[in-house]
Curated annotation (Swiss-Prot):
One of its GO terms (molecular function) is RNA binding. The lineage of its organism: Eukaryota, Viridiplantae, Streptophyta, Embryophyta, Tracheophyta. It comes from the Eukaryota. Residues 1-13 form a transit peptide. This is APO protein 3, mitochondrial. The gene is APO3. Belongs to the APO family.
Length: 402
């Protein structure tokens, strides 16, 4: 993307200069300077700081497309007031081709958490006591970006403490749905009785993973839609569900026993990074069929056909909504929130990141940074974000750099 911009700027300057006639042949070169809508997949800049909390999150799907879908659904209800829902998972059935994907995501999530819990003993993690800043390295950095209480009196300097695995990877929680088809919403009075679990785990359960602790109803026949209301005429059968829970739990336990081997830090870091990529890829596939909702103003998330009705939003304009969330379509960053940290190029050096050189430092997701410091190779898609091609100037050379 940068090369394209440089070529465009250079040709524009040449054409506008007084020497354009003498070098007309240069501008007529067969150079493809067309700007594609799709950005270079290998180029990813350092993520920008979060926007103002008063602004709503952008819609992944354009509003015109959402209105068109709503009109089609309304017209279909008028034409067929009573109909059988045919497309899973809206009809209460599982998507057959995504059952294995759900098991893979669940397995990769367990391997990711297990690997990070072992790597954290070798790669220190630091967390600011007053804000959400996370740093991976022997010592906390000196970059003044703290926004917590009293940050003005400390010149925005962070106050570091020892971090945990939950600071490295963020799995937001949502309400667990026993029956996503007939009862897709949790009301306000049920907020203390319905358990909340990780959104990734809830997505796997709704896609076919059976867990004894969090049961879910499985159907063999689709449900009916009568004037927009979901009705189920199938008899409840608990026998098959119990067998599925027992077999799935047994397979997971056997898989964990087989993989309990002593591995080096480099091998463990590489496998943990692979588990992260496989989990994110699987979650993307599941989100194409299973709906996930997020609030447009706060981090609340819900997996299911609709968002819940619990009135606990405290973000912008929540008084106008009576505490209800402004639900919209979620993205992968809402389900698996990457915590971006500053990249430490040489962890064994012992030097601390300086605030005056922060524009030369790169960033990366905390999981990637932790695995890279553990010995795993840097993924190609994070080379530019980590700014590996940038040479750090010395502290006394900062004023000499343009």
């Amino acid at each position: 993307m940068q090369r394209r911009k440089l070529v465009e700027i250079s040709i524009f300057v040449i054409r506008k200069s007084n020497f354009s006639s003498s070098i007309k042949s240069l501008t007529n070169l067969d150079v493809d300077v067309s700007v594609d809508n799709d950005e270079d997949p290998l180029y990813a800049d350092v993520p920008k700081p979060p926007k103002d909390k008063s602004e709503r999150k952008p819609y992944p799907t354009p509003m015109k497309e959402l209105i068109r879908r709503a009109k089609e659904e309304k017209q279909l209800r008028k034409l067929q007031p009573c109909r059988v829902l045919e497309d899973p998972p809206d009809n209460g059935l599982l998507v057959p081709e995504l059952v294995d994907v759900a098991h893979c995501v669940h397995r990769c999530r367990n391997m990711l958490l297990s690997g990070l819990s072992k790597i954290i003993h070798h790669v220190p993690v630091h967390r600011c006591r007053l804000c959400a800043e996370v740093h991976i390295g022997k010592q906390g950095h000196e970059i003044r970006t703290c926004t917590g209480p009293g940050s003005g009196s400390r010149s925005a300097t962070h106050v570091w403490k020892r971090g945990r695995v939950s600071d490295v990877v963020l799995f937001p929680k949502c309400f667990h749905l026993y029956d996503r088809a007939v009862k897709p919403r949790v009301i306000h009075d049920e907020r203390f009785t319905v358990p909340k679990i990780s959104a990734v785990l809830e997505l796997c359960i709704q896609a076919g993973v059976d867990l004894e602790k969090f049961p879910s109803k499985r159907r063999s026949k689709p449900v009916y839609s009568i004037e927009g209301r979901i009705v189920d005429f199938e008899d409840v059968n608990d026998g098959n569900s119990e067998l599925a829970v027992t077999s799935t739990t047994t397979l997971i336990q056997e898989d964990d026993r087989c993989k309990e081997e002593k591995k080096s830090l480099k091998e463990l870091s590489f496998e943990t990074m692979e588990s992260w990529f496989e989990m994110v890829l699987g979650v993307r596939k599941l989100m194409e069929r299973y709906r996930v909702w997020t609030c447009g103003y706060c981090p609340e998330i819900q997996v299911g056909p609709k968002g819940h009705k619990v009135r606990m939003c405290k973000a912008t304009k929540h008084q106008m909504r009576d505490g209800m969330h402004a639900w919209q379509e979620a993205t992968i960053d809402d389900v698996v929130g990457p915590t971006y940290v500053w990249h430490v190029r040489d962890p064994t050096d012992g030097s601390v990141l300086d605030n005056s050189l922060k524009r030369f430092y790169g960033k990366a997701p905390a999981v990637i940074e932790m695995c890279v410091q553990g010995g795993a190779p840097v993924p190609d898609q994070y080379n530019s974000m980590m700014r590996l091609d940038v040479v750090y100037p010395q502290r006394d050379e900062v004023d000499l750099v343009a």
